[in-house]
Amino acid sequence: KISGIPENFWTDLDPRMLRQILNSVPLSGLPAADDLLLRALLAETLGDETVLNTRVQALIERGAVQAAYSLLGQAQIQSQEGFALFAETALLTGNVERMCRQLNLSRHLSDNEALKVYCQARFGSWNTAELNFFTLDTLGAFPPTLSSLLAVDLDPELADSLGLPNVEPNQLTALEFQLRAGAGQPVPTQGLPLKFVPSDLSPSSGWKNQIEAAERLGAVGSLPAAQLLERYKSGQPSASGGVWDRVNAVQNLDLTLADPIIDPSDE
């Protein structure tokens, strides 16, 4: 294998024990250790779906959501657990079309009625989505915050009249994160779990947000150092202190290394 990981690396493992092992692995910040773990988690190896789901969950928790999405995209998802992870990574990466079309065709893959409304509104029948939402909402199927977010998603004009409560970082779901962004009330990723941080790498995010997101992900090995360096070099800081001091330091070092070394003997 290109990864250097044996094909049978993940076979014959107890998923519960694997979960315990992965939970005990710290976010070390040691590049060699983080790189080895990520290569192992991403390796194309044999193993059942439960083991795959455990690996994907570990990737999500480390903020490697695009890698987790790609890994699941190569699998034949047959369980609700596997599809829940696929939906989470799709929402976190913005790659929702394939996931939603699959859910619209195979609704047994999820019991998440809010996700079904979300997907039906985008890649199915908007009228059906609206009918399902109002029916389920009348029956009390959605918590108040989620009900408001889905209502705004179906009718953006309600955004100004429906106030949303503050976010609980440890209770925020990928669907709510996307719905809040769509309602014009995006959730800042500072202080949120790592899985939400890659959204700030988008070109539409401010430069400062991109740098801080790249730093958080780079610190646990979920973003290549070259991509962090690219963001440090992508502009000129107009302020000082904090992140801007780091930007200046990196840019000055880069300029120094780029200068030709003058050999005194040539003078």
Identify what each model region corresponds to.
Residues 1-267:
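Alpha-helical solenoid repeat scaffolds
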